[in-house]
């Protein structure tokens, strides 16, 4: 196979796929999150001993299906950190692009100074399994309990078990926000299905 002559030329692979080869330059390792952001930006609500708060979070990942485990990085400087660590629970709420300005506003304020539910006109609903409130305006709410705090002291990394999930029936694929740094978000795009190419046993395992 002849090597491509420049960045824009497509190379014919042995498997028949024609793919573009990209010419690359050095990139700051501290900024790789722009390409490896883990998922949609979420709003995390918490409550403890009469206090409640909401924080904006972009660093989270699904770790297991059953039980449903989610890992989250929550800075110790965040007002929510102590509320969540002491109560050992929270709610992960999924906003859509309709809430973009609220997502930014929540991230720009501290719960030590304002009640973010009141400040941003958000509706707090009682959860079924935890004391932290749901945010009614969000497309989905996932009630969480702290499952493992072994990495909290060293990495601010919480592992939660989702004990109850509430999801709006439509749209099936909501427009969510994905933070790339420097105040810029990407929006979830069109859906591409390759279901027919998957081995059946893998459809629910990855």
Model-derived segments and their meaning:
Residues 4-13:
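A cross-taxon signal for low-complexity, glycine/charged-rich
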Residues 15-206:
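Basic, polyanion-binding surface patches
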């Amino acid at each position: 196979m002849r090597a491509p002559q420049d960045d824009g030329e497509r190379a014919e692979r042995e498997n028949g796929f024609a793919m573009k080869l990209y010419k690359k330059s050095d990139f700051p390792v501290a900024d790789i999150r722009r390409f490896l952001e883990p998922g949609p930006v979420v709003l995390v609500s918490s409550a403890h001993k009469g206090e409640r708060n909401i924080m904006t979070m972009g660093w989270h990942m699904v770790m297991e299906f059953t039980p449903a485990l989610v890992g989250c990085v929550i800075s110790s400087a965040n007002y929510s950190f102590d509320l969540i660590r002491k109560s050992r629970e929270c709610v992960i709420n999924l906003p859509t692009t309709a809430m973009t300005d609220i997502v930014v506003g929540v991230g720009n304020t501290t719960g030590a100074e304002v009640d973010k539910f009141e400040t941003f006109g958000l509706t707090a609903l009682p959860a079924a399994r935890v004391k932290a409130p749901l945010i009614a305006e969000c497309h989905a709410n996932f009630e969480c309990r702290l499952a493992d705090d072994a990495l909290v002291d060293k990495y601010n990394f919480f592992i939660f078990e989702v004990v109850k999930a509430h999801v709006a029936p439509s749209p099936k694929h909501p427009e969510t926000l994905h933070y790339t740094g420097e105040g810029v978000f990407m929006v979830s795009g069109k859906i591409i299905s390759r279901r027919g190419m998957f081995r059946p046993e893998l459809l629910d395992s990855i």
